Design a protein with these regions (language model features):
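Small/aliphatic-rich secondary-structure junction motif
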Residues: 11-70, 93, 148-149, 158-161, ...
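General small-molecule cofactor/ligand-binding pocket signal
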Residues: 47-49, 98-103, 154
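Structural beta-alpha unit
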Residues: 89-125, 130-132, 160-170
């Protein structure tokens, strides 16, 4: 827990990545489950955010002309929005749209900025499971975010089944 005094969180952020493989969607659902538990226990306000950027944005921005880039960028944005909406539609609890954010950029950049600006007390996020001792506890993105936020962070490790499924999908 970050901070000088111990208190219940008032603002909780579920940082999820609902797109792509079924294992990502399952991990995002687990993160939401944990965030909802914290919110139920603490009576905090829940926010949900996902960071997105077009695949290969760094390279393609310099290669595509403006019209192609804008179309590619918009398609990626629509896909990210659809993935997020689909996951939230499966949930039994309705979340006000003003507490759901689709943040442009990488998770390592966009999530800390949003958390700090919104005065988030607790971020609930997943890990990818890196190698080594630190990797046993955190993923690279979680490590980067921890260094940039004033919030406490609850990391949810990948389900063993999800980890094997992700490796098989690669």
């Amino acid at each position: 827990v970050v901070g000088e005094e111990s208190r219940l969180p008032e603002q909780v952020l579920a940082a999820i990545d609902p797109g792509g493989a079924p294992s990502r969607r399952a991990a995002a659902s687990r993160i939401l489950d944990w965030a909802e538990r914290v919110v139920d226990w603490s009576e905090a306000e829940l926010h949900v955010a996902t960071a997105w950027q077009p695949t290969g944005a760094e390279v393609l921005r310099g290669v595509l002309d403006d019209a192609e880039w804008n179309a590619y960028h918009e398609e990626a944005h629509q896909r990210a929005a659809a993935d997020l909406d689909a996951l939230l539609a499966e949930r039994s609890s309705a979340l006000p749209r003003d507490r759901v954010r689709l943040l442009p950029g990488t998770a390592a950049d966009a999530l800390p900025a949003f958390a700090n600006e919104s005065r988030i007390d607790l971020i609930v996020m997943g890990t990818r499971g890196r190698e080594g001792r630190v990797g046993d506890l955190l993923g690279e993105t979680a490590e980067t975010i921890i260094r940039q936020v004033r919030s406490s962070i609850l990391t949810i490790p990948p389900d063993t089944h999800e980890t094997h499924e992700t490796e098989a999908e690669s």
